[in-house]
Structure formats: structure tokens, C-alpha cells
């Protein structure tokens, strides 16, 4: 009997969720959608690993890996971004944050210092000929390394990458 009461109570509580009715708060704003990165645009085969952040000035920065020749994790991969100064309604041209010839610059992780406005971008690098399985097996030419870049002008320009691998990556990590 106790189990029946519990199941009945759960069904009664779940009923409004299953009714198909949706409620919208009075102050809800409509969501605007936009395609920021599209396969084949700007000479890149594929864009992956998106990351977004809103700057102290309110600019939306949308980072991605721009994969030049395929969607593969190996090869010539650049870190790019697009900026929006109107909350995401329109987007500026692609800005290349980091291009290291045929190597992999990826995994963007942006952070904004709310006091100074500086945008920090953590990222990884690996040799463009190294495959993921080889990196994990520790048979690759090089290892995956960690870098930081920064912008003090709301994402318009970026510092050169500075390697921080020894201070953030344990020896047993790939």
C-alpha cells in the first residue's frame, strides 16, 4: 500500500510536466538564434569545440577550433573567434587568435577578469601530425601542451601564446 501511495504521488506531481503545456514568465525575452560558424566558411572545413564568454563591456566572444582540411582532431587547426557587440544579433568577421602553421591549437577556455576586463584564453597545442591515440599511448612526437593568451582590448587583438604546461599539467596526464 505504501509503494502504491508513493507511485500515485509521483504520477500526480509529474502530470503537469507531461501535459504538454508550457508556461513563460512575464519578463521572458525571446531568444535570438544565429549561425556563428558554418562548415566551409572562410576556407575552413569544419568548426568544432565552441566556447563563449561575455566581456566586461558586454561584447559576446564566440571561440572555436577552425579545422582547415577535415573534421579530424589531427592536422592544421587554428583557434578563431567572432565578436558580437549587440548581444549576438550580428557577428563580426573571423579573428584568428592562434595559427601555428600545421599544428593543433585548440580547446578554447575563455575567462574574463571582471575587475580589469582582461580576457584570458586557456588553450592546448599539439603537433599536427600526432594522432589522439598516439598522444594517449605516449608514442606521439610531442605531448599535448597548455598555453594562455590574453586580450586587453575586448577581444580585438591577442597576445602571443605563453606555455604554462609545467605549472598546470601533471606528468602522468596526456
Spans of model-derived segments:
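Intrinsically disordered, low-complexity Ser/Thr- and Pro-rich stretches
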Residues: 3, 18-19
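Hydrophobic h-region of N-terminal signal peptides that target proteins for export
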Residues: 10-18
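Asp-box/BNR beta-propeller blade signature and adjacent active/binding-site loops
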Residues: 22-174
Amino acid at each position: 500500500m505504501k509503494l502504491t501511495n508513493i507511485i500515485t504521488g509521483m504520477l500526480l506531481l509529474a502530470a503537469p510536466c507531461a501535459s504538454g503545456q508550457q508556461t513563460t514568465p512575464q519578463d521572458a525575452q525571446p531568444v535570438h538564434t544565429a549561425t556563428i560558424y558554418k562548415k566551409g566558411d572562410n576556407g575552413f572545413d569544419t568548426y568544432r569545440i565552441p566556447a563563449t564568454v561575455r566581456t566586461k563591456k558586454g561584447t559576446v566572444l564566440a571561440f572555436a577550433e577552425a579545422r582547415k582540411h577535415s573534421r579530424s582532431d589531427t592536422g592544421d587547426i587554428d583557434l578563431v573567434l567572432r565578436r558580437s557587440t549587440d548581444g549576438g544579433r550580428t557577428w563580426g568577421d573571423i579573428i584568428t587568435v592562434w595559427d601555428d602553421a600545421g599544428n593543433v591549437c585548440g580547446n578554447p577556455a575563455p575567462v574574463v577578469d571582471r575587475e580589469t576586463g582582461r580576457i584570458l584564453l586557456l588553450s592546448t597545442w599539439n603537433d599536427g601530425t600526432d594522432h589522439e591515440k598516439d598522444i594517449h599511448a605516449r608514442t606521439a612526437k610531442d605531448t599535448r601542451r597548455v598555453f594562455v593568451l590574453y586580450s586587453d582590448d575586448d577581444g580585438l587583438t591577442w597576445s602571443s601564446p605563453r606555455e604554462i604546461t609545467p605549472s598546470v599539467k601533471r606528468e602522468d596526464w596526456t
